[in-house]
Amino acid sequence: MVKKMKLKFLFLILSLLIFTNKSYAGDLTVNDIKSRQIVVCGTSSDYRSLAYKKNDRLEGFDADICRAFATAIFGNSENFKLVYIKRKNIGKALNSGKIDIMLGHTSLSSNEEVSQNVLPVDTLYYDKQVFVSRIQTKATSMNEFAKNKVCVLKNSNAAIFAKEYNNKHALGFNIIEFPDLAALKEAFYTNRCELASDSEIFINDFVRNIKTDNPTQILPETITYIPIKAYTAGNSTQLNTAFRWIINALKLAYSNGITAQTIETFTSSRSTSIQNLLGINQKSWMSMGLLPEWVKDYINTSGNYMQVMDRNIGKSSKLEIDNPQNELIENGGLLVVQPFI
């Protein structure tokens, strides 16, 4: 009898543990993050411009976006950490609760979203796939590179698009795939291929950071545009909603010209969207479990969407990338902003 009771008790404890783990990992909420007292963002080790340390402080686009989440949840922009996650492990990291949101220059295919059980949050920015050449050239057409060897990342979207581009334009490329981006870079700089193809941000990053006597040139041809998105676990719908509106808030501030210098002039705005955005009407942010005036705090320290983009990836960054797709749709770009109502 005692033995049976012990077994039943043990079974009950195990059941509760399993249920708790599934509840936490499968349906993460803002309150779960609050109880942990830190927000955890996934990033990629392949893109230095997204996450790096400078004077013991995390810098880069992903660091600044994660600061927005920390400011909105805790009122402290430094209550966050970044974790390097490989592409194949994104779903596992999200659904196990290892990270709350995946940033890290991620653009998953439909098959990857389904198989990894992840949910897109919002488009963070647009990148584009380009070619880089080992030699300086005055070529005016990609036909002049016909039959060249092209380095790409194995089983990547870049490999798929490079092959489709090659077939479409009948260039006869010999496309060589490498298991990771480090191997791709090494192959390119040891003359195993004349061209390499990947995202403009990655290509700019490694061309500028690897010391070599070999001249290189990023070619003007665009293979495709790449929407870079944030992702949450597939069942974390409440958290997904909160993160989506946080990202939208930075874009909305930019679309209205809200900066640290102008923000006080907007506190008397009669726009419902602006009143909700700045926490004058507190209900909208509080309904998501977020601090109502976090946008004002973040804008004053880090700026709006375009200021974050520009200093980390855009024209004012070391990459000096001028990508018009990262403008608002009304300015000829692809970014769409929702009113906060």
Question: Can you name each region flagged by the protein language model?
Answer:
Residues 31, 63-71, 88, 92, ...:
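Solvent-exposed, polar/charged alpha-helical surfaces in well-ordered, non-transmembrane soluble domains
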